[in-house]
Curated annotation (Swiss-Prot):
Gene name tied to this protein: metG
Protein name: Methionine--tRNA ligase
Cofactor comment text: Binds 1 zinc ion per subunit.
Motif 'KMSKS' region: where in chain: 344-348
GO annotations of cellular component type: cytosol
Amino acid sequence: MVRYMVTSALPYANGPIHAGHLAGAYLPADIFVRYLRLKGEDVVFICGTDEHGTPISFRALKEGRSPREIVDEFHEHIKITFQRAKISFDFFGRTELPIHYKLSQQFFLKAYENGHLVKKVTKQAYCEHDKMFLPDRFVIGTCPFCGAENQRGDQCEVCGRPLTPEILINPRCALCGRPISFRESAHYYIKMQDFAEKLKRWIENQPWKPNVKNMVLKWIEEGLEERAITRDLNWGIPVPLDEEDMKNKVLYVWFEAPIGYISITMEYFKRLGKPNEWKKYWLNIDSETRVIHFIGKDNIPFHAIFWPAFLMAYGKYKDEEVEAEWNLPYDIPANEYLTLEGKKFSTSRNWAIWVHEFLDVFPADYLRYYLTTIMPETRDSDFSFAEFKTRINEELVNNLGNFVHRAMTFVNRYFDGIVPERGELDELDRQALEEIEKAFEEVGELIMNYRFKDALKRVMELASFGNKYFDHKQPWKTAKEDRARTGTTVNISLQIVKALGILLEPFLPDASEKIWHLLNLDEVKKWKFKELPAGHRVRKAEILFKKVTDEQIIYFILNYMGRNNPEGAKMLLEKYYKREDVIKVAKEKFGEESKIILKRIYKDIKLEEGKEEKEMEYVKFEDFAKLDLRVGKIIEVKDHPNADKLYIVKVDLGKEVRTLVAGLKKYYKPEELLNKYVIIVANLEPKKLRGVESQGMLLAADDGENVALLMPDKEVKLGAKVR
């Protein structure tokens, strides 16, 4: 029996996941795995955070925090985001696991022992201002191949070619922006030319997507060169050699990150109490395992050339139980890029749809559905808010949801919720049953060929057929004159509903579960259709999907994009909506805060366009006296684990320490808040904000663009009352 080891690219633990990530490497893998599970296949689905990338060190330096704090925060954040998006990993690990350190060092040593590494002293990028060697991603400049500016020194985001700081035009430090110099430093390189012919022969025989196969064969034909696999960094996996010039150096993340697929699998089975089970999936013991890596376009060379070369460099794995070669990738179904309203996603400019924010407003199934319909399988595709709304409303609500609701309503209204007997079948009845069988066969074949857009389209065609079948049969008419015929129509309609409940599972797991609940089924879903028996009782009809409204989209743009990227939000709002409609939604959703939000986006807005200022309302002294305002000192600042814009702040009030949640992240760095004297409302009723209880409120001034904390102009006793 074939086994499947399915992986998704390890996301960097230095920031949240956006819709482009989801559409590229995670949603397609999840659809594929859910289908395999329905088929009863032996499949393990693995992922985890890549925690030693230079972006992590970069962010830690900029924020004055330790890399470990960064990766701990984002490992948990990314894990929760995937859970909310219904990505069903068997195990979501991390490369900070001890087992990963051990295995990565083992891979290095085996390549070293087998003669595939060479030490070279080369000139490395160095910043005289920051007094440090610069990893490739800390250097920016112009790509020598395509001329794109502001490209990092490891890979061009425009043409996809690998880069090094040495070949960049006008290289400079990404931290301070100053020109860099180059200093000599010893590093180990993997001799990629050792594997060129073997890789070429192997790749030529792989059934990969043309976009993947053509790219990597072209690279090999152009010649593979030695590539550094160690770095001058203090965060990462130490080089496992006792050599003076290897001290304070780590394994290059592009070398050790893919090893994480194996180490995370090891950790998964270790936690299951089966520490040797991983070998069935990663070692070529019986030629029955298919290792499938789902990745984005930018990861193709690393997974299709370098990663297989690392496995070859290791040679045979050997222990007391087994001696075998590593399984090379069976397939690498890489997707192209997703753009947003015609522009490339940009995390630095906050031109992105962050998944955790989107799921605050819209159900996971809506995001999964739309991303699948536009999945960039063979070419780049675009996320459009207008198309998102149209597809959800016309396809999910009006087609799929409508058919399920019609069938469920009718069986309850005319047959007391009991599946009726089926009478004599006519040609259309038989066609309906054939359509069910054909759908299972065709959808399954499309999924196995990674044609997820077409597979979902085929599922929706069955829902469309169900509506046409229902309309043609007109059971609302036959119910009055031919109950048996009506029973047949309802029976077959419910068979289609059940089929949809299974067929939707890989794509829309929540909708699939709702249909299963409506049909009152407790059987395990399988990719083999078994009819609902006559006499089975179903539940009352419920609405499966609700329409997406303009108000929801405006709210999302205002509340999330508007706070992070006001110019981008303005462009979107002006593209789709009248300003008065935006103002109306802002007033309804945000109240008084709407003025601040609108002013941030529309610089030219007049107050009367938003809301007239009320005359000042006086507060009675006895009401003001109820506030207990105290002086405190901030002694600790941490990122909120469940919110990007919030800090968790500890404030010393002299006799006690309070925990507060404060929305200051956009305006203050942690080090700017530490040891500051502040004013807090001490008798405010505690309230949980994103899962953390806030025991008071910091006082601050807000003019719509800037926020400034209120602070005493000289030190006073902690806990002193403000009068």
